[in-house]
Amino acid sequence: MNEQCDLPATPLSPHRPLDEFYAAPAARQEFVNELFDEAAPDYDWVSGMMSFWSDRFYRKDGLWKAGLRSGMKLLDVASGTGLMISAALELGVDPAQVTGVDPSQGMLAQNRERNPKTVTLLEGKGESLPCADSTFNFVSMGYALRHVEDLRKLFGEFHRVLRPGGRVLILEITRPKSVVALHLMRFYMQKLVPRIGWLRRRNKSTAKLMQYYWATIAECVPPAVILSALEASGFKNVKRTTTGAVLSEYVAER
């Protein structure tokens, strides 16, 4: 699907300021970091629950279809608890050739527990990656596009750290077009998953995380804007495919 649109040259947030969660846009990053720090111990369970436990297969399949192979140097942005990295390792990627970047110390702690010590994990934001130019063959991002501040800066950084011919894969959840599907998805994410999470761990952060997750999905810019921003950042062969109407895979080449 190639539904790009023209964009003005200004900072491009993935969604409006969500003032029901933080007082001002400047407070957004601190809120997000704190939210993920608190929810980190339960994040893998939440991810599995939201996807009916298909998330691990979907990540691995997406990476393979986008062209990730052994011998490549991988950067996983907004790496979280390391689920994308684990999927890459299952495909034969050398752990010593993998770098993960995330702004949440809590998520990085979970990541370190999951993956080999030879994986490099760095604290940092996608819009200002702590990585040298033209370093990686592949950049991945799993379900974190909605949590950055500026898509243009993010994609510019992707382009900067990739080698010529390098590839990008962005996995994301997209707001369903069907009204029925929209209501079902809202109920599942805002009511059912938080309730089960509370019964399971008594962690209030799980409910808060799901409320925020849903808000970012409901308010996220449409796919056409994301595709156009990738093209404007210098990427070619930009495309989007979907699974089940709500799971989007954005791929592009440097």
Predicted feature residues:
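Class I SAM-dependent methyltransferase SAM/SAH-binding core
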Residues: 73-128
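Conserved beta-strand signature within the Rossmann-like core of class I S-adenosyl-L-methionine
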Residues: 166-173
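A short glycine-rich, Lys/Arg-flanked "PGG" loop and its adjoining helix->strand segment in the class I
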Residues: 152-164
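A short SAM/SAH-binding and catalytic strip from SAM-dependent methyltransferases
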Residues: 137-151
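Conserved alpha-helix/loop element of class I SAM-dependent methyltransferases that forms part
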Residues: 52-72, 87
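C-terminal alpha-helical "lid/dimerization" subdomain adjacent to the S-adenosyl-L-methionine
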Residues: 101, 175-229, 233, 239
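A short acidic, Gly/Pro-enriched loop at the edge of an enzyme's catalytic core
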Residues: 127-138
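Core SAM-dependent methyltransferase catalytic element
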Residues: 233-254
